[in-house]
Design a protein with these regions (language model features):
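Bacterial N-terminal signal peptides that target proteins for export
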Residues: 1-9
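Bacterial N-terminal signal peptides
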Residues: 8-16
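Bacterial Sec-dependent signal peptides at the C-terminal "C-region" and cleavage site
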Residues: 16-24
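Conserved SGNH/GDSL esterase-like catalytic core that processes O-acyl groups on lipids
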Residues: 24-29, 34-131
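Surface-exposed amphipathic alpha-helices with a cationic face
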Residues: 137-141
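A short helix->loop->beta-strand "cap" motif at the edges of active sites that frequently abuts
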Residues: 143-146
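Substrate-gating cap/lid alpha-helix
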Residues: 155-172
């Protein structure tokens, strides 16, 4: 099943980028711990690295730049100059080295945003998260850059999690 998920993800993402005519597709990933590769004992098993390896097997000039960092929310990837966000418990700052402004400065063909749950975990309302996504997407579109927003996925596709599992929820 894990190979099926990875194959499907790769197929969909490659299909989205097949129309690029430039030699070498340039993709930037913005995200949190899953995209950064947390939870894997071998960084080559992180989904971004597997995706990079796959794309480069098709064309060695394809690049995938990973700007993800564990714990990040959509607040961290907002444009440079965006005011910090106050959750009521702490202030979330924009990271100018890992945000949409930095991503666009790399002249990508596409940006993948992988931010599964940290906004909710930090008490950021869904409406605010959606507003952040809209701002980021609008900036990318204005630059002619495609954006894909991914959902949650396993941290890796090659290691089994060691439980605990209920009887009806066993790994493949």
């Amino acid at each position: 099943m894990k190979k099926t998920i990875l194959s499907t993800l790769c197929f969909l993402l490659v299909s989205c980028f097949m129309f690029f005519t430039d030699a070498g597709t340039r993709i930037v990933v913005l995200g949190s711990s899953t995209a950064a590769g947390a939870g894997v004992s071998d960084s080559n098993r992180a989904w971004v690295n597997q995706y990079r390896t796959y794309l480069q097997s098709i064309d060695p000039t394809n690049t995938v730049t990973n700007l993800a960092k564990g714990g990040y929310t959509t607040c961290a990837i907002m444009p440079t100059g965006t005011n910090p966000y106050n959750t009521g418990n702490h202030i979330l700052e924009v990271d100018t080295e890992r945000n949409i402004t930095k991503a666009l400065s790399l002249s990508p063909n596409a940006i993948i945003i992988n931010m599964p749950t940290n906004d909710v975990s930090n008490g950021i309302p869904v409406a605010t998260q959606m507003k952040h996504f809209a701002t980021i997407i609008d900036l990318a579109k204005a630059a002619g850059v495609k954006v894909l927003i991914t959902t949650s996925q396993p941290h890796n596709f090659g290691e089994k999690y060691d439980g605990p599992y209920s009887e009806e929820h066993q790994p493949d």
